[in-house]
Amino acid sequence: VIPILPFRATRPTAAKAREFSLERMEHLSADQILETAGRLPLSLAALVQAAMAGEGAAKLASLRADKALLQEPEPTVYMHRQVKGGRKHCGLVAGVRADAFTNGVIRAHRHARGEDAAQWRLLTERCAAQVDSVILGFEANEVITDLFEREVNDRPLFHVVAGDGATHTLWSGRRAADLTTAFAEVRSAYVLEGHHRLQNLQPNDPVLCMLLPLNEVFARWSPRLVRPSADAAWHAWLQSNAEMVAEPGMPAAGFADACVLRDGAPAWMRFRLPPPPLGATLADATESGRLDALLRAVLGADSLAAASHQPGEDRVMQLQALLAGGAWGSVIVLPHPPVRELTLLADAGERLPAGSTWFEPRVRSGLWLHHHG
């Protein structure tokens, strides 16, 4: 059960939404936040910069006074659609009760760095608000799909092109009760972004979330899919080199943990990585551009879609792949030791429309604030 909680959002006004919105804060360096705050005084970056200086609550009050932000009079949920560069996300924005993250209903595939979690707590305390959302992926059923389609046919609160080029459309959820009931039938969800916002939660805390249907994440984007030539070989390799484990842990060097989704339910396995030279360190593989070869060696020849990565990036790199066929379903791989934290996402082909592949789920949700008051 995904416990959906309507909330009183502090959100941009239609007149100022373009000036407020930009990409998620973790995608910006401190210098970029400072530069953006100076250039766009009504932006989310300006609020974050003020919070870093200990003046977050005052800045939030001034944004309301300037009518850049308003707080809704009644609790509700929202539909938020974002389009940029041919990619589209449309999901439900709502509070989710914190115990769903601690009782195994919502699973996280990695742990947050301590400094990221600490910075998030400080930002939340200084603003008295959650200033960005946790991004969740879930398997949408027919009822939820129908409700989503009906919601986005209503008149939006606003439709703007933001400063980063993303188009944002926001609807107030007129069917909040129906959506809450429908999500009570969703048995599991998975954290795609925002792990550092989930530290030290109290059971009844509301967590601001954007819930994306997984078919939105597995969107049609790239034709570079490589179909596996020998599916049986992949399964033989997996059976010989993997074992199921109760929970992810800290495996020895040369091993990795993976979250395996079987019929929508998560399970964990541990498998052996190939020996050198195919098992070269992740740092070597990344810097030399041989990461594709390493991952193909792990999964078997022709099992992997062309991996996309940007060497030298400090943030977590999401590497996507698509396995056509197979009973295991989605696999989230956590290499250890984490020289550079990598995540490999793969999914069984029959779960996706023909011609589909994965793209990097950099979901921009800089429109959102959840005021605790």
Model-flagged regions — what are they?
Residues 1-373:
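Surface-exposed, charge/polar-rich loops and edge strands
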